[in-house]
Amino acid sequence: MKKSLLALALIAALPASALADNWMMRVRAIDIAPDVKSSSLAGLDVSSEWVPEIDFTYFVAPNIGVELILGTARHEATLNGASLGKLSHLPPTLTLQYHFNPTPTIKPYVGAGVNYTRFYNVDLAPGLSVGKNSFGGALQAGVDIAVTKNGYINLDVKKIWIDTDVKNNGVKLTNLEINPVVWGIGYGFRF
């Protein structure tokens, strides 16, 4: 009976040991710095914002990770410096990462993926609205610097392509490319 219980305990422990160190969770402070382009309105801009962000990375191999970032921000839209109102967006971004050095203290990585941006809580000047949510690409580069066995300081930069329409009373006024560069610093824990 004891041998059977020991065998059952070993079998139950296998998945846990197989998953050891396959996950990383990071908490970052990020600066979302839009690189705004408008198809027909010169002077249209969207404010830069610092916000908290959380992300999860699953390592499918020692050098290959899949990261999902989650964060939201509220920006002010302006035209030639005059406020047009505020809008919020949620751009979950999924990237496939390559980690160059999976074991040393300094672990640089690069990634590429996609984002889906959902605009919500849009409070623009009367008659103005955001016309659509957005799918776009994402590129990233970063480094994890070990400070403990499983703890890391993280520096990260992403370029995310976000595109929508601005409408006036339901009629498309302009195409708006927000396309932010996202700078981040944070702490990660691998488990």
What are these regions (language model features)?
Residues 1-22:
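Cleavable N-terminal export/targeting peptides
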Residues 75-79, 86, 148-191:
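Predominantly the C-terminal beta-signal and adjacent terminal strand-loop region
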Residues 20-33:
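Transmembrane beta-strand segments of Gram-negative outer membrane beta-barrel proteins
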Residues 26-28, 55-59, 140-146, 152-154:
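Short, conserved structural micro-motifs that define repeat-unit consensus positions
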Residues 21-22, 55-124, 134, 183-191:
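Gram-negative (and chloroplast) outer-membrane scaffold detector with strong preference
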Residues 13-17, 99, 147:
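Hydrophobic membrane-targeting alpha-helices
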Residues 37-41, 80-82, 122-124, 166-169:
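Outer-membrane beta-barrel and related beta-rich outer-membrane complex signature
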